[in-house]
Amino acid sequence: MMKSIILIVLDGLGDRPGSDLQNRTPLQAAFRPNLNWLASHGINGIMHPISPGIRCGSDTSHMSLLGYDPKVYYPGRGPFEALGLGMDIRPGDLAFRANFATNRDGVIVDRRAGRENKGNEELADAISLDMGEYSFRVKSGVEHRAALVVSGPDLSDMIGDSDPHREGLPPEKIRPTDPSGDRTAEVMNAYLEEARRILSDHRVNKERVKNGRLPGNELLVRSAGKVPAIPSFTEKNRMKGACVVGSPWLKGLCRLLRMDVFDVPGATGTVGSNYRGKIEKAVDLTSSHDFVLVNIKATDVAGHDGNYPLKRDVIEDIDRAMEPLKSIGDHAVICVTGDHSTPCSFKDHSGDPVPIVFYTDGVMNDGVHLFDELSSASGSLRITSYNVMDILMQLAGRSDKFGS
């Protein structure tokens, strides 16, 4: 019998011991009976995202977990962000991640314009322009975030960013990284100058300044990319795929792979999200889909904040939400892992491996009874993210035999 698959990715799960938790990791310090139950009934190990020592992004790691080599298919983050916001991207279009930022006297004083969102749709509409042969479409996202899609002849993604990536610096002039990007850099610089003029004079920003708030008078762009020619998830893995995720960029990746994207009320993509709702939705989807991806972002948020106790508490909240997984092993394969480590001491992605567990009825436990960085390392698996899909398909009775 072929089984459905649920892959649960706890973003930035892995960590390092911290004095705030008596020299334990947040995972070790957390009360986690359901994760430990999965470990006690499953196959355990450690997983290197991409390969040992690589500090990967969530985007490249998720691509590899889904069976795609990011060295071949990764288009940059821009297309994911735009697709995640529901924008159309045609072949040849160029997509960017974008922020509304605050420019004061030619210097970026806040890359996020106070994380203000009210009025950003108006700002985005105001700088969605046609300039000669080129059209520029901007869509507002969560808080200060946005995406930009450029259409026109001979666009190249061989260009840099306008985002200086920290405050106290002027916005960068976009420069080509290859001669093929010369014309695109010129077009982008002309557009960003016009956008700056429009934003500085816009009613929304004048109102913000009047009320002592930061104006979003600069559009910072980065991560230019084009949509690649890429096989759908169904074409590649012979499964009908779904995702239950909150982050717009990850929705964009799933849409690029032609997976079905589902929203859950209260699933915010941050701390306090509706974790139980996500798990219950994934369980429900096993009746209509062969594969379900769940991403929970809150662990990564706590790691980037350097907050050991918060990351421990988030893991405990997530663990409570996982109770329904223990009763579906007869018809589903469950995998729980991270996409990378985000140690609280480092406040960024590291190259450390992450724990991983595979569970379904009938698998032989490898003697591991706790789910954490150290205990899982005594399990039977030492794998990379490229191995995960093969293991899942084999356990689900969906793999082909290699040879005769």
Swiss-Prot record:
Gene Ontology MF: a single term: metal ion binding
A single GO BP: glycolytic process
Catalytic activity: (2R)-2-phosphoglycerate = (2R)-3-phosphoglycerate
InterPro entries: Alkaline_phosphatase_core_sf, ApgAM_prokaryotes, Metalloenzyme, Pglycerate_mutase_ApgM, Pglycerate_mutase_ApgM_sf
The enzyme's E.C. designation: 5.4.2.12
Ranges of biased composition (kind: Basic and acidic residues): 162-183
Keywords: Glycolysis, Isomerase
Family: Belongs to the BPG-independent phosphoglycerate mutase family. A-PGAM subfamily.
Function, as annotated: Catalyzes the interconversion of 2-phosphoglycerate and 3-phosphoglycerate.
Protein name: 2,3-bisphosphoglycerate-independent phosphoglycerate mutase
Origin organism lineage: Archaea, Methanobacteriati, Thermoplasmatota, Thermoplasmata, Thermoplasmatales
